[in-house]
């Protein structure tokens, strides 16, 4: 286990039902904020049109994924719609040690495992709700990524996903994309001011005390 006191960044877990906007929000936030990075998951699902290995996901075969599980490479992993997704330990630890804040676009299973991991003191969790079920269904249809059968399955699973909303610290209704995006960035800024998130604060307080001693001795 890596000493978490060396970490300088925080982890932002964003979850939502499929179609509620978590991936679009996460990508836009990362694009506009150079100190925020995206957690690139490993997955066994096939790449979609336009996706590149190592950008949206690290695409692997199931045998390779199982080997990574055996070798304890993941902070968390879960099966979603018949495909496996996992978060790499070494990738996350490197980004945190480089001072990056990291956004996770994960379902409630992944969110729970990250919050319960050894990195839990660094985690901030956000759940995104759709403005209505009708809007959620329309978004799934309009993105043209899935056939009708898969859309129906995603709608069924969405109810289960939404049932976990109360496990998250911050809840937002995605009825205004730009507003929600700005609010998430504000949350990140505020959370980094919390005492337990400012891991270099004890060193700074020690420095102030040394300066006090020097000031008193010279007075």
Regions found by a protein language model. Give the residues of each.
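Short glycine-/polar-rich loops that comprise or flank the Walker A/P-loop
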Residues: 9, 119-124, 166-168
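Ras-like small GTPase catalytic G-domain
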Residues: 121, 133-136, 141-163, 178-179
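Conserved glycine(s) of the Walker
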Residues: 16, 21
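Extreme N-terminal, non-catalytic leader segments
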Residues: 1-11, 34
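NTP-dependent small-molecule kinase module
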Residues: 2-5, 145-146, 160-219
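N-terminal phosphate/diphosphate-binding loop that engages ATP/GTP or pyrophosphate donors
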Residues: 23-73
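ATP-dependent NMP and nucleoside kinases share a basic, alpha-helical "lid"
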Residues: 64-73, 87-144
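Short, well-ordered alpha-helical microsegments
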Residues: 22, 110-113, 180-181
């Amino acid at each position: 286990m890596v000493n978490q006191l060396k970490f300088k960044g925080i982890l932002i877990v964003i979850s939502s039902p499929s179609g509620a906007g978590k991936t679009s929000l996460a990508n836009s936030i990362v694009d506009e904020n150079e100190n925020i990075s995206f957690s690139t998951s490993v997955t066994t699902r096939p790449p979609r049109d336009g996706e590149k290995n190592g950008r949206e996901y690290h695409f692997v075969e199931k045998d390779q994924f199982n080997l990574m599980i055996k070798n304890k490479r993941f902070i968390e992993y879960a099966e979603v719609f018949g495909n496996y997704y996992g978060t790499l330990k070494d990738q996350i630890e490197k980004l945190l040690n480089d001072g990056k804040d990291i956004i996770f676009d994960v379902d409630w299973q992944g969110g729970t495992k990250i919050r319960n991991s050894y990195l839990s003191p660094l985690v901030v969790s956000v759940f995104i709700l759709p403005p209505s079920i009708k809007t959620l269904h329309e978004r799934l249809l309009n993105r043209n990524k899935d056939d009708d059968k898969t859309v129906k399955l995603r709608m069924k699973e969405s109810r289960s996903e939404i049932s976990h909303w109360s496990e998250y610290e911050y809840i937002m209704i995605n009825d205004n994309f730009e507003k929600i995006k700005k609010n998430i960035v504000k949350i990140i800024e505020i959370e980094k001011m919390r005492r337990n998130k400012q891991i270099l604060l004890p060193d700074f307080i020690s420095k102030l005390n040394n300066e006090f001693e020097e000031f008193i001795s010279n007075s």
